[in-house]
Amino acid sequence: MLLPLACLHGRVAQCLTSLLVLAEPFPRPRRGAKARGAAPTSAEPAPAVAKMAAELYPPASPSAATATDIANSNAAGAAESTKVGLCCPPCLAPAPLPPLPAPPLPDNNNPESPNWQSFHPTLRERNALMFNNELMADVHFIVGALGAARRVPAHKYVLAVGSSVFYAMFYGDLAEVKSEIHIPDVEPAAFLVLLKYMYSDEIDLEADTVLATLYAAKKYIVPALAKACVNFLETSLEAKNACVLLSQSRLFEEPELTQRCWEVIDAQAEMALRSEGFCEIDRQTLEIIVTREALNTKEAVVFEAVLNWAEAECKRQGLPVTPHNKRHVLGRALYLVRIPTMTLEEFANGAAQSDILTLEETHNIFLWYTAAKKPLLDFPLTKRKGLAPQRCHRFQSSAYRSNQWRYRGRCDSIQFAVDRRVFIAGLGLYGSSSGKAEYSVKIELKRLGMVLAQNLTKFVSDGSSNTFPVWFEHPVQVEQDTFYTASAVLDGSELSYFGQEGMTEVQCGKVAFQFQCSSDSTNGTGVQGGQIPELIFYA
């Protein structure tokens, strides 16, 4: 019976495919096979063919094998359907094809895999892949102190391109020829941050290592990384770490950071001097702080801070904490404290009982307070100037009317933002418009609903349209470009003045203030009019 032409062409193509896949030809029929009518079968490949197919196509992974099995079963079903539908003779049935191998998954993180460069199309990506990588490394660093050192691979060319120090080290007249270089004065984590930046331009700073990273950036003259470290420190600067950062900024010769530290220390002197960080500074920095004219705190606080530092220094030096040893470690710093500017009560209850002063010094200071003929003292006699508070007034005029404005225990509130860091010391409030009056007041400062500071106190107004200051216990640090909410709740029956012609933006010296209405305000205060006419701040 003749086969249809389409069936014949399909079977010929399948047989050719089978011949191409198989590594050996079909076995020839034995002599006389034709006479007996036997035909060669191709249903099973020869053992050698099966073996070669197994070598060429090793077993795939389970997931790939599952997919291959499904494909083979579909192919087998299709072949069976073709065989039944076309009634092809068994002699033309193709041999089963070996399973196709699963495509390899790209390994983007393994530079040792073939053609890894293809997965990183940009120069920056390829360079970043070489960071902390042994591949092609031609130098190694032993970084850190003995016992905590770490071996770091690197590439001379990359380091020399990013740092003049490394260039001189590897390609200068006195180039280093050793394959391992010891760096005991740099922390391993900081050194890796340095190298990561040099390989990829990525800066990965953390609070625990930023100072060590700044040291490394300074040592190897990488100014962009050093600048990023300084910016990070300025952002995280607050009273509890300002003294430590002041010490470090002087060490690294960073005048901008030094100035930012002084702004915090001056405005929040009491909090800064009572912080744990103050006890960690060196003696030279201690002397500089104690001589500071702008410290905005009482001298009794300065004296207490100096004693705390002396106790910590005795422990650092392994000395017993005694009055004698405290005087020894303080040296001339003790005589920079302006003890005579304390009140008599502060001196009698504090410095006079500290045992760090000699009996003669204590006697002479008491005489200086009380006697008409005052003895000579070795301590400064002039009081510190401190900081002069600034006031941001947001109304162009004030007024009063017979039926308003009245404090009724409701909240007057306004939101504000600044374009640089300031320290809010208090609020200026309007008082009675009908004579002298006393008010109970609660002032509050919030950020994103969180209370940063509050104070419950009283103030007396004299009947004028002047504003009356109400202070927080400590100045509150306010960061730029963030809205804060200032609120006041006053309890009083007298009519009061109120502001009008309010401004949305006010420039106070170097600081620009921006105001907007607050949803907390329930007594009518807003941008255009109402209470809280002033913000009192240091900058």
Swiss-Prot record:
Q: Which residues form the signal peptide?
A: 1-23
- Which keywords, in A-to-Z order, does the entry hold? Cytoplasm, Signal
**Entries under SMART domains matching the protein:** BACK, BTB
Top-level division of the source organism's lineage? Eukaryota
InterPro entries reported in the protein's UniProt record: BACK (IPR011705), BTB/POZ_dom (IPR000210), BTB_POZ_BTBD6 (IPR049738), PHR (IPR012983), PHR_sf (IPR038648), SKP1/BTB/POZ_sf (IPR011333)
Q: Name one Pfam family in it.
A: PHR
Q: Where in the cell is it found?
A: Cytoplasm
Coiled-coil regions listed in the entry: none
Query: Which parts of the sequence belong to the BTB domain?
Result: 137-207
Checking PANTHER family in the record gives:
BTB/POZ DOMAIN-CONTAINING, BTB_POZ DOMAIN-CONTAINING PROTEIN 6
Please describe what this protein does: Adapter protein for the cul3 E3 ubiquitin-protein ligase complex. Involved in late neuronal development and muscle formation.
Any idea what this protein is called?
BTB/POZ domain-containing protein 6
Source gene?
Btbd6
